[in-house]
Amino acid sequence: MIQRLWASRLLRHRKAQLLLVNLLTFGLEVCLAAGITYVPPLLLEVGVEEKFMTMVLGIGPVLGLVSVPLLGSASDQWRGRYGRRRPFIWALSLGVLLSLFLIPRAGWLAGLLYPDTRPLELALLILGVGLLDFCGQVCFTPLEALLSDLFRDPDHCRQAFSVYAFMISLGGCLGYLLPAIDWDTSVLAPYLGTQEECLFGLLTLIFLICMAATLFVTEEAVLGPPEPAEGLLVSAVSRRCCPCHVGLAFRNLGTLFPRLQQLCCRMPRTLRRLFVAELCSWMALMTFTLFYTDFVGEGLYQGVPRAEPGTEARRHYDEGIRMGSLGLFLQCAISLVFSLVMDRLVQKFGTRSVYLASVMTFPVAAAATCLSHSVVVVTASAALTGFTFSALQILPYTLASLYHREKQVFLPKYRGDAGGSSGEDSQTTSFLPGPKPGALFPNGHVGSGSSGILAPPPALCGASACDVSMRVVVGEPPEARVVTGRGICLDLAILDSAFLLSQVAPSLFMGSIVQLSHSVTAYMVSAAGLGLVAIYFATQVVFDKNDLAKYSV
C-alpha cells in the first residue's frame, strides 16, 4: 500500500508529468521522421509513378491544414472523465498505429482480401501513408495544449516547451537513423521479417510505449458549462445529433475559407514579407528533405526501386536509401546543435546576418548535391542544410514577436486591433498566453532575445487564449459572427501554415518535373532554384526600424 502511494505521488510530480507527456512527442517524431525517409522509396517499389508518389505525400499536409483549427476548437469544448486533450490524442494515436500496421503489410492484406492484389495493395499503402502523415502531424496540437494545461506558470511553461522541443529533435534523430540500419541482417530479422517489417515493428513498439505513458498523465478537471465557442466549432445544438443542426453546421463550415482569406488579405506588410520569405525557404528545404533518399538511391547509387529483390540494381537502391537516411540524420543532428547556439550567434552577428546566412547556405548545399557524385560530399551537404532548418524554426518567430511588441512601429495600420489581448481563459487553455521576450512560444519557438531547441512547427494553432481573433461560430447566423483585433497567435498560425503549404506544393509538381526531365537530379535542382528565390525574399524581410523606410513599408 505504501509503495503504491509512493508510486502515485512520484507519477504526479511535475517533472514526471512533463516526461510522460513528452514521451509521446518523442514517439510521434520518430514515426514521422522514419516515414519521411522510407515511404517514398516504398511507393516507388510497388509501382507508383513519380508524379503520383509526390501527390500521395501531399495528402496528410492538406488534410492537416484544414482540420487542425477544427480539432483545436473541438478539444477546447470537450467534456469527459479523461480530460479535454487525451481523447483526441488517443484517437489520433490509434490512426498512427493503424498506419504503422498497414504500410509494411499492404501486400499481405491485399492478398487475403482480393485475388488481384496490386490495386488493393496500392490503395492500402496510400491509406497508410496518408494516415501516418495526417494523424502524426495533427496530434502535436492537443499535445501542446495538454502541456499548456498542465504547466500554466510562466517559468514552468518555458521549461515544459523546452523539453518538448528537445524531445522532437531527439525523436527526429532516431527516426532518421533507424532506416539507415540494414535490418535484414540483424538479429531481429528471423522474428520480425523483412527490412520493412523490422523497421515498422520497432516503430510500433516505440510508439506503443510512448502512447501508454499518457495513461498516467493527470489532466485538470474542467468544471462548469462549456465556454463560448471560439475559432471553429460546432455549437451546442449539434451535440444533440439533430440532422437539421448537423446540416447547418456543415453548411456553415464553408465560411472557414472566406474568413481565412479575409484575415490573410488584412495581414500587415511586415508580416506578409516574413511569410513569403519563410514559405519560399520551407519549400526549398522540404523539396530537398522529402526526396533526398530517393535521389541518393536512384541518382547517386544508380539503383532501381522497381527491380526484383535480390538483384544488383535493387541492392544498390537499398544501400542508397540507407545512406540517404544517414544524411537526414546528420541534418537533424546539426540543426539541434545550431539551435543550442542560435542565441549566441544572434547576439554576436545580429538576426539579419544569421537569417540571411542560413538561407544562403541552402542553395550552396543543394547545388553541391546536384554536381557531386561523391557520397561523402552529398552527405556533408545534407548535414549542412541543418543550419537552415534550425534558423527557420526560430528566427521568423522571434521577428513576429518583435513586431507585436512594438506594434506602433512595425504594425501602424493594424486594422481592428483591440489592444492586442483578448483575455485569458478562465479554464485551462490550449496554448500559452501572449509570449514575452525570451519566452518559448507554445510551438517550441522562442521570443525575442532567446533561442530554443529545434522543434518542427505544428500546422496551425487551434482555439486558444493567446489573442486569437478569428471568431467564427458554426451554427450561428451570419450576423452573429464577428472578427475583433488580430493577435500574435493568429499571425504565428499563419507563419506556421507555411510549413504545411511547403509540403503541398512540391507534392503536386515535383513528380511531373522528374518525369519530364527523366532524372531524379531534378529534385535537387528544383530545391536549389527555390533556395535562390528564397534568398531574394529573405532580403526583403523587415529586421529593424531602419528597414521600414528602406522598403517603404
Curated annotation (Swiss-Prot):
It is a multi-pass membrane protein. Pfam families: MFS_1. GO terms for biological process: positive regulation of fatty acid biosynthetic process; positive regulation of glucose metabolic process; regulation of oligodendrocyte differentiation; sucrose transport. Expressed in the epididymis. Primarily expressed in the prostate, but also in other tissues. It is found in: Membrane. Optimum pH is 6.5. It catalyses: sucrose(out) + H(+)(out) = sucrose(in) + H(+)(in). InterPro entries: MFS, MFS_trans_sf. CDD domains: MFS_SLC45_SUC. SUPFAM superfamilies: MFS general substrate transporter. One of its GO terms (molecular function) is sucrose:proton symporter activity. The chain crosses the membrane at residues 19-39, 52-72, 88-108, 120-140, 161-181, 198-218, 275-295, 323-343, 353-373, 382-402, 522-542. The keyword Transmembrane applies. It comes from the Eukaryota. Keywords: Membrane, Symport, Transmembrane, Transmembrane helix, Transport. One of its GO terms (cellular component) is membrane. Belongs to the glycoside-pentoside-hexuronide (GPH) cation symporter transporter (TC 2.A.2) family. Proton-associated sucrose transporter. May be able to transport also glucose and fructose. This is Solute carrier family 45 member 3. It comes from Mus musculus. The lineage of its organism: Eukaryota, Metazoa, Chordata, Craniata, Vertebrata.
